[in-house]
């Protein structure tokens, strides 16, 4: 039984990355920005796994573990900053917070 072709996996990773990039550029809510960054990081992790499985190397899975640990750290720090900004400014809009800075 054969697996998914590499082109299909990389196409899916590229589509996910583009969706995350569009969300990052279009949305102004900090929660949606963090979710878009998570989608982009997962897309890059998927590309590593697909490329690693193509050449039967464990390097892709090792990079996946590193990307997931980086994503977990980014999510925890991002959510902590999100809570602090919401408590201080009562909004999650990035433009409003930057205008309030003075």
Swiss-Prot record:
Keywords for the protein's UniProt record, in alphabetical order: Cell inner membrane, Cell membrane, Membrane, NAD, Quinone, Translocase, Transmembrane, Transmembrane helix, Transport, Ubiquinone
GO MF term set: NADH:ubiquinone reductase (non-electrogenic) activity; quinone binding
Reaction it catalyzes: a quinone + NADH + 5 H(+)(in) = a quinol + NAD(+) + 4 H(+)(out)
This protein's record includes keyword NAD: yes
Main localization of the protein described in the UniProt heading: membrane
Quaternary structure and partners: NDH-1 is composed of 13 different subunits. Subunits NuoA, H, J, K, L, M, N constitute the membrane sector of the complex.
Family listed: Belongs to the complex I subunit 4L family.
Protein name: NADH-quinone oxidoreductase subunit K
Organism of this sequence: Shewanella oneidensis (strain ATCC 700550 / JCM 31522 / CIP 106686 / LMG 19005 / NCIMB 14063 / MR-1)
Name of the gene this protein is made from: nuoK
């Amino acid at each position: 039984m054969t697996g998914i072709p590499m082109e299909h996996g990389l196409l899916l990773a590229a589509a996910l990355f583009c969706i995350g990039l569009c969300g990052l550029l279009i949305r102004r809510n900090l929660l949606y920005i963090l979710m878009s960054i998570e989608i982009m990081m997962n897309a890059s992790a998927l590309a590593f796994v697909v490329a690693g499985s193509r050449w039967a190397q464990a390097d892709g899975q090792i990079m996946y573990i590193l990307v997931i640990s980086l994503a977990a750290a980014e999510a925890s720090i991002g959510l902590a900053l999100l809570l602090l900004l919401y408590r201080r400014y009562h909004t999650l809009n990035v433009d409003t917070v930057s205008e309030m800075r003075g």
